[in-house]
Amino acid sequence: NVDHAYLIDRLGPAFDSIKPGNDITQRVTPQGQGRVHLNYQDLQQVHICVSTPGLSLNDPRRYACSLLNTILGGNMSSRLFQEVREKRGLAYSVYSFMMPHADTGMCGIYLAVDPAKALEATALVLEELDKLCAKPVSAAELKDAVEYTKGSLLLASESNENQMVRCAQNEINFKRDIKLQEVIALVESVSAAEILELAKSLFVRNRLGLTLLGSVKDKGPFEDILYT
C-alpha cells in the first residue's frame, strides 16, 4: 500500500530545485473535420482507421467513454469483434480505442482487411456506430462492460509500475490523488442513457475521418457511405 501524502513528504525536498513553470494558457482545441484520406501502397491488406474527436482527460464523461469503447471494440465480446471478425470473417484484427489528452482527445477504430472487402468492412463499422447512436445498450451489455473495466483496473493495480504511473498521472493531470475505489464507483454509476448521449455526440458522420492504407485508389465509394 502506498501512502500518497507520506511519499510526497519524503520525496518533495529532492525536487525543491525544480521550479514549476507557467501553464499554457493560449490553447485552441482542434476542431476535427471529416474527410477520407487514401495512402496507396501495394499491400496484401488494407489498413482502415475511422476516427473522431474524443474527450479530454478532465471531461466528466470519460468513464462513460471508457465503457462505450469497451462495448464497441475493447475486447473479444465487443460488437465490432463479434460482427466484423466472428460473424463475417472480414478481419483478424479489429478494435476500437480512446486517446484522451489535456484539452481534447480522439476515439478511433482500426481493422485490416482484404482490399476487395474494404468497402464492405467500412460500411459494417459505420452500421455499428449507427446502432450505438440509435438506442441504449442493454443492461446485460452494460453490466459486462462495467465488470470488465473493474477487472482491468484491479489487475493493473497489482503492478508496482502501474501504481507509480497512476500516481504520476494523478499528480500531473488532476492535481490530486484519485483512489481506485473512487474510479470504480464512477464507472459503476454510468447509465445506458449516458452512453447513448455520448455516442450521439461523438459519432457524427460529418466529423468522422477515414484513412485507408493499402491498395485502394478510389475514395469516392467510401465518401458515399460515410457522408451520404
Region spans (language model):
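Charge-rich, well-structured scaffold segments of protease-associated domains
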Residues: 1-22, 38, 56, 64, ...
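M16/MPP (pitrilysin/insulinase) zinc-metallopeptidase core fold and M16-derived inactive scaffolds
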Residues: 74-90
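Catalytic cores of enzymes that engage adenine nucleotides and/or redox cofactors via long glycine-rich
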Residues: 28-32, 83, 109
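Generic alpha-helical structural context detector
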Residues: 69-73, 82, 147, 169
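His/Glu-based metal-binding/catalytic segments typifying zinc-dependent metallopeptidases
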Residues: 12, 23-78, 216
